[in-house]
Protein backbone atom coordinates (compact mmCIF):
# COMPACT_ATOMS: atom_id res chain seq x y z
CA UNK A 1 0.00 0.00 0.00
CA UNK A 2 2.82 2.41 0.85
CA UNK A 3 4.45 1.68 -2.51
CA UNK A 4 1.29 2.74 -4.28
CA UNK A 5 1.28 6.07 -2.45
CA UNK A 6 4.98 6.68 -3.16
CA UNK A 7 4.58 5.83 -6.85
CA UNK A 8 1.51 8.07 -7.15
CA UNK A 9 3.36 10.94 -5.50
CA UNK A 10 6.39 10.44 -7.78
CA UNK A 11 4.20 10.49 -10.89
CA UNK A 12 2.54 13.66 -9.70
CA UNK A 13 5.92 15.36 -9.31
CA UNK A 14 7.20 14.16 -12.67
CA UNK A 15 4.24 15.41 -14.69
CA UNK A 16 5.06 19.03 -13.92
CA UNK A 17 2.73 21.95 -13.71
CA UNK A 18 2.04 24.30 -16.60
CA UNK A 19 1.38 27.71 -15.15
CA UNK A 20 0.60 31.06 -16.67
CA UNK A 21 1.75 34.55 -15.83
CA UNK A 22 0.78 38.09 -16.69
CA UNK A 23 3.67 39.96 -18.28
CA UNK A 24 5.04 41.90 -21.25
CA UNK A 25 5.73 39.40 -24.03
CA UNK A 26 9.30 39.78 -25.30
CA UNK A 27 11.42 38.97 -28.31
CA UNK A 28 14.63 36.94 -27.95
CA UNK A 29 16.62 40.15 -27.40
CA UNK A 30 14.55 41.07 -24.29
CA UNK A 31 12.70 43.73 -26.29
CA UNK A 32 8.96 44.24 -26.01
CA UNK A 33 6.57 44.28 -28.96
CA UNK A 34 5.62 47.89 -29.76
CA UNK A 35 1.88 48.42 -30.20
CA UNK A 36 -0.78 51.01 -30.89
CA UNK A 37 -3.96 48.93 -30.90
CA UNK A 38 -5.36 46.24 -28.61
CA UNK A 39 -6.30 43.73 -31.38
CA UNK A 40 -2.63 43.43 -32.44
CA UNK A 41 -1.57 42.49 -28.92
CA UNK A 42 -4.53 40.19 -28.36
CA UNK A 43 -3.66 38.27 -31.54
CA UNK A 44 0.04 38.10 -30.62
CA UNK A 45 -0.66 36.91 -27.09
CA UNK A 46 -3.29 34.31 -27.98
CA UNK A 47 -1.08 32.89 -30.76
CA UNK A 48 1.58 32.34 -28.08
CA UNK A 49 -0.82 30.56 -25.74
CA UNK A 50 -2.09 33.38 -23.51
CA UNK A 51 -5.76 33.86 -22.67
CA UNK A 52 -5.74 37.44 -23.96
CA UNK A 53 -3.64 40.56 -24.34
CA UNK A 54 -3.83 44.29 -24.76
CA UNK A 55 -1.66 47.30 -25.54
CA UNK A 56 -0.31 48.93 -22.40
CA UNK A 57 0.01 52.58 -23.39
CA UNK A 58 2.75 54.69 -21.81
CA UNK A 59 3.77 51.85 -19.52
CA UNK A 60 7.15 51.00 -18.07
CA UNK A 61 8.50 50.02 -21.51
CA UNK A 62 6.48 52.49 -23.58
CA UNK A 63 3.59 51.20 -25.69
CA UNK A 64 4.05 47.45 -25.30
CA UNK A 65 1.93 44.30 -25.43
CA UNK A 66 0.80 42.92 -22.07
CA UNK A 67 -0.38 39.28 -22.03
CA UNK A 68 -2.66 37.60 -19.53
CA UNK A 69 -1.93 34.02 -18.47
CA UNK A 70 1.08 33.57 -20.75
CA UNK A 71 2.70 30.08 -20.65
CA UNK A 72 6.10 29.66 -19.00
CA UNK A 73 7.77 28.63 -22.28
CA UNK A 74 7.16 32.07 -23.86
CA UNK A 75 9.81 34.73 -23.14
CA UNK A 76 8.79 37.78 -21.12
CA UNK A 77 10.46 41.15 -20.60
CA UNK A 78 12.88 41.00 -17.69
CA UNK A 79 14.82 43.86 -16.07
CA UNK A 80 17.86 44.82 -18.07
CA UNK A 81 18.61 46.30 -21.47
CA UNK A 82 16.93 45.51 -24.75
CA UNK A 83 19.86 44.04 -26.70
CA UNK A 84 18.36 44.43 -30.18
CA UNK A 85 18.33 48.23 -30.32
UniProtKB/Swiss-Prot annotation:
Gene3D superfamilies in UniProt: Knottin, scorpion toxin-like (3.30.30.10)
Record family assignment: Belongs to the long (4 C-C) scorpion toxin superfamily. Sodium channel inhibitor family. Alpha subfamily.
GO biological process: defense response
Protein name: Makatoxin-3
SUPFAM superfamilies, per database record: Scorpion toxin-like
Cited SMART domains: Knot1
Cellular component, GO annotation: extracellular region
Disulfide links within the chain: 31-82, 35-55, 41-65, 45-67
Primary role: This protein markedly relaxes the rat carbachol-precontracted anococcygeus muscle. This relaxation is inhibited by the inhibitor of nitric oxide (NO) synthase, N-nitro-L-arginine methyl ester (L-NAME), suggesting that the response induced by this protein is NO-mediated.
